[in-house]
C-alpha cells in the first residue's frame, strides 16, 4: 500500500521528475542501441545465419481484396502450438550494404521513416532488393509521441507510396519511447496512428516494441498483430505482454543484426499485409 505524502506538492513533483528521468534513459538507450548495431555490423562483416529455422519456399501468390482479411490471431496460436517458425530480419540505414540476395531470411522488414520528416537513406535500396528477392517484405515507422500521430502516419505513407507496392507488404509502427508523455497519452497516440494507417490503406498495421514497453503502453492494442523484442527468451518462446493473446513476430537477438522468428508461415504473414499492389 502506498504511503501518503506529508507534503502535498512532493508527490506530483517526484512523479514528474521520475517520468523525465525514465524518458531520458529510454532515449539514451535507443541511441546506444543504434550505435552498437552499426558497430556490430561492421565488426561482424556478414550476418551469422547458422541455426536459423528452415521454412517452406515462398510462392508469391496474389492475395484477395482488403475486405477478405484473414483472421489474425487463430493462425498465430496454431503455428505457435505446432512449433513452426519462419526466420526473418529487420534492417535500417545502419546496415546499408546488407546483401539480401545472399540472405536466408524468409521475411525482411526495413525502416522507412521516423517522426514527421526523417526518411531512412537506405529504404529505397532495401525495398527494391526485397522486391527482387520475392520474400515477404515490410516497412516500419519509428514513432515519437510528442508529435501529431496523424502527421507522422501521413509522412510514413507518403514515403511508402513513393515506392512500388506488392501484395503482402507489411506495415509496422515501431514505438519505443514516450517523449515525456504519460502512459495514457502514449497509448492514445499509438491507437490514433494505427487506426489512421488502417483507414488509409485497408491494412491492419503491426505493432513493434520491447516487451516491457509494450506491457506498459500497449493495452487495448490487441487487434494489431504484435512484433515483440525480448532478448532473454529463446526464439519463439516469448509470452505476449499486455492484453495480446499471442505474438506474431519475436525479435530474439540484435547480434550481429536484428533477427526474428514468426509464428506464421510466409504466406500467412502476407495475409496480414497489403491485399493489392
PLM feature spans:
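Short, solvent-exposed loop/turn segments at secondary-structure junctions
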Residues: 178, 212-213, 233
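Glycine-rich, charge-decorated loop segments at or immediately adjacent to ligand/cofactor-binding or catalytic sites
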Residues: 149-151, 212-223
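Sec-dependent N-terminal signal peptides
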Residues: 38-52
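Boundary/entry segment of secreted carbohydrate-active catalytic domains
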Residues: 25, 29-31, 48-49, 53-115
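Terminal targeting segments of Actinobacterial cell-envelope proteins
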Residues: 1-39
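Substrate-binding cleft of extracellular glycoside hydrolase catalytic domains
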Residues: 81-104, 110-203
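Aromatic-lined carbohydrate-recognition surfaces of secreted/lumenal glycan-active proteins
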Residues: 202-215
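Functionally critical loop-and-helix segments that line ligand-binding/catalytic clefts
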Residues: 68-101, 221-277
Amino acid at each position: 500500500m502506498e504511503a501518503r505524502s506529508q507534503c502535498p506538492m512532493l508527490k506530483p513533483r517526484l512523479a514528474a521528475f521520475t517520468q523525465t528521468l525514465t524518458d531520458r534513459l529510454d532515449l539514451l538507450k535507443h541511441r546506444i542501441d543504434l550505435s552498437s548495431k552499426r558497430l556490430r555490423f561492421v565488426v561482424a562483416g556478414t550476418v551469422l545465419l547458422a541455426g536459423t529455422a528452415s521454412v517452406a519456399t515462398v510462392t508469391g501468390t496474389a492475395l484477395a481484396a482488403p475486405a477478405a482479411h484473414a483472421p489474425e490471431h487463430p493462425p498465430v496460436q496454431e503455428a505457435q502450438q505446432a512449433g513452426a517458425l519462419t526466420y526473418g530480419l529487420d534492417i535500417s540505414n545502419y546496415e546499408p550494404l546488407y546483401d539480401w540476395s545472399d540472405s536466408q531470411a524468409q521475411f525482411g522488414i526495413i525502416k522507412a521513416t521516423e517522426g514527421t520528416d526523417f526518411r531512412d537513406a537506405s529504404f529505397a535500396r532495401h525495398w527494391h532488393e526485397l522486391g527482387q528477392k520475392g520474400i515477404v517484405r515490410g516497412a516500419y515507422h519509428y514513432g515519437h509521441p510528442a508529435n501529431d500521430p496523424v502527421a507522422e502516419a501521413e509522412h510514413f505513407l507518403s514515403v511508402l507510396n513513393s515506392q512500388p507496392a506488392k501484395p503482402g507488404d507489411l506495415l509496422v509502427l515501431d514505438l519505443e519511447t514516450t517523449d515525456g508523455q504519460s502512459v495514457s497519452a502514449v497509448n492514445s497516440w499509438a491507437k490514433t496512428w494505427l487506426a489512421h494507417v488502417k483507414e488509409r490503406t485497408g491494412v491492419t498495421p503491426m505493432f513493434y516494441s520491447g516487451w516491457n514497453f509494450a506491457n506498459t503502453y500497449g493495452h487495448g492494442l490487441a487487434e494489431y498483430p504484435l512484433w515483440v523484442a525480448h532478448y532473454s527468451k529463446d526464439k519463439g518462446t516469448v509470452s505476449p505482454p499486455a492484453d495480446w493473446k499471442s505474438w506474431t513476430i519475436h525479435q530474439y537477438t540484435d547480434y550481429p543484426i536484428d533477427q526474428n522468428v514468426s509464428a506464421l508461415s510466409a504466406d500467412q504473414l502476407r495475409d496480414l499485409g497489403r491485399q493489392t499492389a
